[in-house]
Amino acid sequence: MQNKIILENMTVDELKEFFVNNGEKPFRALQYFQAIHKNRIFNPDEMTNFSNSLRGKLNQYNDIKNCSIIKRIDSKLDNTKKYLIEMSDGNIVETVFMQYKTHTSICLSTQIGCKMGCKFCASTKKSFVRNLQPYEMCAQIYLVENDLDIRINNIVLMGIGEPLDNYDNVSRFIDLITDKDGQDMSIRNITLSTCGLVDKIIRLANDDIGINITISLHNPFDNERNKLMPIGNKYSIEEILDACDYYFKKTKRRIGFEYTVIENVNDSKKYMDKLVSLLKNRNCLLNLITLNPIEEFNQKSPDRYKMTEFMEYMNKNNVNTTIRRKQGIDIDGACGQLRINNMTKRGVK
C-alpha cells in the first residue's frame, strides 16, 4: 500500500504525477488543485466531479489534515479580527485579518513558536515546536476567507515564527498561493518580515521569487541590537544591509526596515543619526512601530509626539519613513500575545 501523503502541499505538476501513477488521467490534477485552492473543497467526498472510485483513492492515499478556527476576537476600535487556528495535531497559531479602505490584508504565522528569541516579541515566550507546512499556511487564508466571505488582497508573513527559518515550506506556500489556477495572489502583494538571516535573504534573491521583504532592525548599533535580538550575534547590521543591497539589485523590490521605538532606549537623536547614516542612500522605507508592551519586557512605549518627531527627523534627512498604524490593540493585536494568553490559561508551558 502506498504511504500516506499530503496532496494539499503539491503543485499541479506533482499532482499530475500522483494521479497518473494511480491510473487516473492527468487533467484530474488541475481539478483537484482547483477544488482545494480555488473552490475551498477539502473533503474528497464533496468533490462531485470525481467518481466514487477516485474519491476512494484520495481518501486512501491522502493524509488529510484539517485545520480549524477555535477562536475569533473582533476589535471594537477598527476592523481587525484576531484568530486562533488549531492545526490537526492540536497546536495553535495566530492569524490576524485587517481591513483597510483600499484593501484587505492577512498576517500569517509560519512556525509554531519561534527560535529567534527577540526580547520584546511575545512569539518567543513559549518554546519552539515545529515549522508549519505549506498547506497550514494556505489554510489560515482559506479559513478566514470562508469565515468572513471575503477575498484577501495582501499577505504579510509577520505572524508567529521567522519565515526564512522555514524557507522550503514558505517558498512552497508562495508557489501554491500565487498559482493562477488557485488563489492567484500577486507576488507583489506578499511581504515577508525577517530578523535578518543573511544566507536566506541571498538565497531568496537568487531564487528570484520577487516578494517584498522587510527587515526587523529595531536598533542601529550592533552591540545593543544583539541584546534585543540574539540573531545579531551571528549577522552584523552591515552584513544584513549588504544582503539587502543584493536583494534589491536582483529583484528591484524596495526593502522595508521595521524599527520598534522604545522610550528612553532607542529613541534619542543618537539613534536617529545612526539610522540616517545607515539608510539615507538606500531605496528603502523605514517603518516606525510603537512598542507593544508585554509582561516579560518591562519597557515603555513613546507617546505619539515622540513618534511624529522621530518620523519627521528621518524624512527631513532623506530617509523615507512612516509610522505603522496600530491595529487591534484592544484584542492583544501584537504578534503572539493572544496565543500566549490562551496557552497560559490552558496551563501549557
Swiss-Prot record:
The keyword Lipoprotein does not apply. Its main location: cytoplasm. It is an enzyme of class 2 (transferase). It is found in: Cytoplasm. It comes from the Bacteria. S-adenosyl-L-methionine binds at G161, E162, S193, S216, L217, H218, N292. Residues 100-324 form the Radical SAM core domain. The active site is at E94 (proton acceptor), C335 (s-methylcysteine intermediate). [4Fe-4S] cluster binds at C114, C118, C121. Pfam families: Radical_SAM, RlmN_N. Its EC number is 2.1.1.192. GO terms for molecular function: 4 iron, 4 sulfur cluster binding; metal ion binding; rRNA (adenine(2503)-C2-)-methyltransferase activity; rRNA binding; tRNA (adenine(37)-C2)-methyltransferase activity; tRNA binding. InterPro entries: Aldolase_TIM, Methyltransferase_A, RlmN_N, RNA_MTrfase_RlmN, rRNA_lsu_MTrfase_RlmN/Cfr, rSAM. Disulfide bonds join C107-C335. Specifically methylates position 2 of adenine 2503 in 23S rRNA and position 2 of adenine 37 in tRNAs. PANTHER family: 23S RRNA METHYLTRANSFERASE, RADICAL SAM CORE DOMAIN-CONTAINING PROTEIN. This is Probable dual-specificity RNA methyltransferase RlmN. It comes from Finegoldia magna (strain ATCC 29328 / DSM 20472 / WAL 2508).
